[in-house]
Amino acid sequence: MEGKNEDMHTPRGPEDASNIADEYPSPERQQQGDMLGHDIHHHLDMHHERDARDTHSPGQTDMQTELAKQVAAQAIEAAVAHVQANADRQEAGGTEACGQVSNGNQRDIHMREEPHLSNSQHHPRQPVFPRSRQSFIALSPTSVATSIAGPSTLRRSPLPDTFSRSPAPLSANDQIAILRESYARNPNPDRKELERLAARTGRPWNKIREYFRQRRNKLRGLEQLEKMEEPGRASGWLQITYRSAPVTSQVPQLALYNSYRHRFDPYSSSTPLLGGQDLIQLACATFPGCEMARDDGEYVLKGLKEKDKEREDALGDNEAMGRKGREIDPEEWERGMEGLVEPLRAGSWLLSSFQSQPGTSGSDITQTDLYTSYAARFSSLLTGVSGTSNGNAHLNGHHGLSDEEAELRNHAESLKAFEDAGLGDTQGEEDQPPTVEESDQNETSPASFPADPNPLPQAPRESRLLTPVELINLTRMTFPACEPCVDSSGRFVIKGLERREGLEPGRKSREGEMFPFALMSEKQPGEEFVKVMKRKLASLHPDAIERRNAGESKRKRDDALTEEDKELIEGLKRFRGSKLGEQVRDVCVSQ
């Protein structure tokens, strides 16, 4: 009996193991349905309870391997679900390709594990055997997550906004700085260097080659000027660097002189530099229309402009950034001002032609001169109005030549009355606007034009001039510091207003238009420079040191002066402290 009991309780094969499982159902077999929804950590906790039974089942290796596969499939499903949930929360805006890769991996895992799941479902009496510790280590959460999420992470395509963007194009000043730096290193670059600069600046290589060629020619011309004498050298430098321009363009006098002084050697004894006053006068004589002026407290040269060949050659004609960085052409400004309507046109003209100088003691502008200049500047734009009204009168047949002559006569009389009495006579001011307004009404009246089969919609354009009162009021609004008044001579003037041009028509040039170059304080040499020069002079004359040590210089100083020399020295001392001496010193400094 004992032998039978031992045979009964000692499992010897798969059949005995299945019988034992029927008599003593395993707790793992009852909880197998509940464990399908748990993760891998729950299996790790149950591993310690099954570890003790692992030593009593040495003959059940095949069943254990198959069960390990089933548990591995469950662990993989749980890991995939966990990783997919985290990926959905962290990367809600991920790309479609990433989702396809992860879904494909999950689909492959399900397809690989379906046979094991189906086999386990067809054997309900199959017992659950514990698996080895190595299987749990191989299927740890970190390893499973890495094996599942790793390939999808590597195959994930970058987001659209993370692609490498092309660098922003360089500005005009940056391109010129790069070209100048390259020219300083190598004035004659080869084809490879030109292509490298083209890739760096974004300009064609042939344009860069032309820039280098013109810069070599320009500097070659400046090198030839080094050997010339003044004033020919300064005149040639002015013609190379500057050009004539409209009066609206200007160059500061101090900037012009500093450019000239920095270009040539100021310490050359053979070809000394011109003074500031001589250079400014030479510039006015070299360029017709160039004149000295004072604009908003700054001494400038009107009608002069610096050449911009380097900028134009480096950037080309179709470069948008180059157009933004270039200076506005004064001629284009004048044409654009003519296209404006009143009072914008008159306001722009006032700002470009006059300036406010309340502290000056010069002659004020009369109101008659102001309106005469305004009418002379824009009266040519009214020629089309008179011609149109003439044609309209001829088409209508209601207005004869007598009416036109009367209108012109009234207009001339109003201007004459205004010029004679300034703003005191208001009769001309009242007569002038109706004349111009009547011409506008005749021009824009629909009955005066013949019927056009294809009329084009066009807005009527105002082409009249401002009245004297309107122009004076606009001047007061444009320059608040100015004030219309009557001077001591009984003239109607605008106090505190002066022209921007250097020379007023019919008058002498104003004082103080040239920069006071004589008052420019030169920098005093430093102590180190003085010490170096003393040592240099001492090395050139070593005998002077010996004589100084011997006391010869003292004996020469102690020589008695004659009475005439003493009287001369005393007279010079008195003259230096007198008012006449101060005046002479000021004149010498100013010259």
Curated annotation (Swiss-Prot):
One of its GO terms (cellular component) is nucleus. The keyword Transport does not apply. Residues 1-15, 543-560 have a biased composition (Basic and acidic residues). Disruption phenotype: Shows normal growth at 30 degrees Celsius but exhibits growth defects at 25 degrees Celsius or at high temperature. Reduces resistance to osmotic/salt, oxidizing/reducing, genotoxic, endoplasmic reticulum (ER) and cell wall/membrane stresses. Reduces LAC1 induction mediated by nutrient starvation and leads to greatly reduced melanin production. Markedly increases the basal expression levels of ERG2 and ERG11 under sterol-replete conditions and decreases the induction of ERG2, ERG3, ERG5, ERG11 and ERG25 under sterol depletion. Significantly reduced the virulence. Residues 176-223 bind DNA. It is found in: Nucleus. It comes from Cryptococcus neoformans var. grubii serotype A (strain H99 / ATCC 208821 / CBS 10515 / FGSC 9487). This is Homeobox domain-containing transcription factor HOB1.
